[in-house]
């Protein structure tokens, strides 16, 4: 799932009544909102600078301050963003724990949209933690919630379910789910999810020993991700293209895609991604 945009701060109204509110509480509330805005701005600035560690801390701080002024939407958005950044850092357990602010707190009136986003994010994190059973549970919860909304997340949910099918050795099911996801994404002009679906289609075909048929959707995914300038997705596309080319017997193409993937990974300073990619490419 993509990082969510920072939400606008809610303006808290003063209490009703004929007497003027005490100055100190009003000042405290104003200070809290200022600190909240500052934390969100610092998180965004650190993200742009590539300081993921600092951004994760600031998203957590923004969520904490939002809780003190009962800005539940901001609690959710910052917790979800913190989870995304932790996962980019390879800290999957902390990515899961960040979502507890939303998923483990039934008292706060989070919107259906925020709960769905958190459930989807948890499914993605559980996949990284190699827990496809839990991932399937949260993906199904998100799918049920999606049915109650004018749902913009249908393609994302189908892609997550396709990934779960791949992790469960059900490549044929994964290919069908990814095809449905690609169709839904195209209908909404959601190019990022369309690329995700095409990449999953390609991987599913490769795992069904159809590597030549895998190349076209993977090339389409790469073209979209290059247009979107998404380096992490480009790395995933190049890795899959190297694997599919090797399986199809085209060693020169496989080597070219591999070398390009290494270049992208090193530019990202993504040591975890580089290690995972090299491990995949060493497999027979």
Features from the language model and the residues they span:
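Residue register of alpha-helical TPR repeats
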Residues: 37-38, 77, 117, 156-157, ...
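N-terminal leader/linker segments that initiate helical-solenoid repeat arrays
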Residues: 16-64, 68-77, 81
């Amino acid at each position: 799932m993509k990082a969510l945009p920072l939400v606008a701060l809610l303006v808290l109204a003063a209490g009703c009544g004929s007497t003027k509110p005490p100055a100190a509480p009003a000042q405290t509330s104003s200070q809290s909102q200022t600190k909240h805005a500052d934390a969100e701005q610092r998180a965004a600035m650190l993200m742009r600078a590539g300081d993921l560690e600092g951004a994760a801390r600031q998203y957590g701080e923004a969520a904490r301050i939002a809780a003190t002024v009962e800005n539940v939407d901001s609690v959710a958005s910052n917790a979800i963003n913190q989870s995304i950044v932790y996962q980019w850092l390879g800290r999957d357990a902390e990515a899961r724990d960040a979502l507890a602010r939303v998923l483990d707190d039934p008292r706060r009136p989070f919107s259906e949209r925020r709960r769905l986003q958190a459930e989807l994010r948890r499914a993605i994190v559980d996949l990284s933690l190699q827990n496809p059973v839990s991932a399937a549970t949260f993906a199904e919860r998100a799918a049920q919630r999606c049915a109650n909304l004018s749902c913009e997340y249908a393609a994302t949910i189908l892609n997550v379910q396709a990934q779960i099918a791949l992790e469960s050795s059900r490549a044929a099911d994964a290919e069908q789910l990814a095809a449905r996801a690609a169709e839904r994404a195209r209908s909404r002009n959601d190019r990022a999810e369309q690329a995700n679906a095409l990449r999953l289609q390609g991987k599913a075909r490769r795992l069904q020993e159809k590597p030549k048929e895998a190349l076209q959707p993977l090339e389409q995914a790469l073209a979209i991700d290059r247009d979107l300038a998404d380096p992490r997705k480009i790395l995933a596309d190049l890795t899959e293209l190297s694997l599919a080319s090797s399986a199809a017997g085209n060693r020169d193409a496989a080597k070219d895609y591999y070398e390009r993937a290494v270049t992208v990974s090193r530019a990202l300073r993504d040591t975890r991604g580089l290690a995972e990619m090299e491990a995949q490419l060493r497999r027979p």
